[in-house]
A protein has these predicted regions:
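Alpha-helical substrate-recognition element adjacent to the catalytic core
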Residues: 8-108
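Short, Lys/Arg-enriched N-terminal segments with co-localized hydrophobic residues
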Residues: 1-6
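Short active-site oxyanion
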Residues: 70-73, 144-148
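Amphipathic coiled-coil/heptad-repeat helices and related helical stalk/stem segments
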Residues: 54-58, 130-133, 153
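Alpha-helical hydrophobic/aromatic positions enriched in membrane-embedded helices and signal peptides
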Residues: 7-9, 143-144
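Surface-exposed amphipathic alpha-helices with a cationic face
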Residues: 62-66, 138-141, 161
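Acidic, Mg2+-coordinating phosphoryl-transfer loop and its flanking beta/alpha structural elements
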Residues: 137, 145-175
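Substrate-recognition "cap/lid" segment bordering the active-site pocket of phosphatases
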Residues: 80-147
Length: 175
C-alpha cells in the first residue's frame, strides 16, 4: 500500500519512441545509403503505422495504471507530422492516454501550423528532447501530480530524475 503524499499523485508520463513503441524497423528502413536518417521516411505516417511494433510490457504498465485511475500522459519528441497516425497506432495497440503531446514539425517553415489536436506550442520544435519534455511538463502537467515517468533516453531520464521524479528507464538510451 502506498503511503503519504505519493497516494495523491495521479499522473504517469510515458515516452513514445523506444518506450511504448519499438521503432527499430522504422529506423532501419529509414537510413540513407550514406548512413544518415531520411527524416521524410522516418516521420511519415505510413512508416509509423506499418513499421513500429508495440513494446508489450510497457503498454501493459500503461494499461494497469490507467485501470487504477491514473492519468496517462504521453510526451514525445516525435514529429507531429505523424500526429494522427500516432493516435491511430496507440488505439490499434490499446495504449490508453489522456493527453498526447508531440514535437511540432521542425522541418516546416513558420507558416506551417502545429498539427490540429496537438497542444504543443510552436516554440518547442527545435528544442533538444530533455528541454522539450521539461517544457511539456511545465506547460501541461503539475509536477506535484506526477507519480512516475517512463522513458528510455539517458539525457531525458537524467532531467526527470534531477527534478526529483521517480523514473523507470526501459532501455539503454545513449543517443
Amino acid at each position: 500500500m502506498l503511503k503519504g503524499d505519493i497516494m495523491n499523485k495521479k499522473t504517469v508520463i510515458f515516452d513514445l519512441d523506444g518506450t511504448l513503441a519499438n521503432i527499430d524497423v522504422r529506423r532501419d528502413r529509414s537510413v540513407k545509403p550514406n548512413g544518415k536518417l531520411n527524416w521524410d521516411i522516418f516521420a511519415s505516417p505510413d512508416s509509423i503505422l506499418h513499421w513500429d511494433t508495440p513494446n508489450e510490457p510497457v503498454i501493459k504498465m500503461a494499461q494497469m495504471f490507467h485501470n487504477d485511475g491514473f492519468r496517462i500522459v504521453i510526451f514525445s519528441g516525435r514529429n507531429d507530422r505523424g500526429f494522427f497516425a500516432t493516435k491511430e497506432w496507440l488505439k490499434k495497440h490499446d495504449v490508453p492516454f489522456d493527453l498526447l503531446v508531440l514535437r511540432p514539425d521542425k522541418f516546416q517553415d513558420k507558416s506551417w501550423p502545429v498539427a490540429d489536436g496537438n497542444p504543443a506550442t510552436f516554440d518547442m520544435r527545435f528544442m533538444p528532447d530533455e528541454i522539450l519534455k521539461k517544457k511539456m511538463l511545465d506547460t501541461f502537467v503539475d509536477i506535484n501530480d506526477v507519480f512516475l515517468v517512463v522513458d528510455d533516453r539517458d539525457k531525458v531520464v537524467k532531467m526527470w530524475r534531477d527534478l526529483g521524479l521517480n523514473t523507470f528507464q526501459v532501455a539503454p538510451g545513449d543517443f
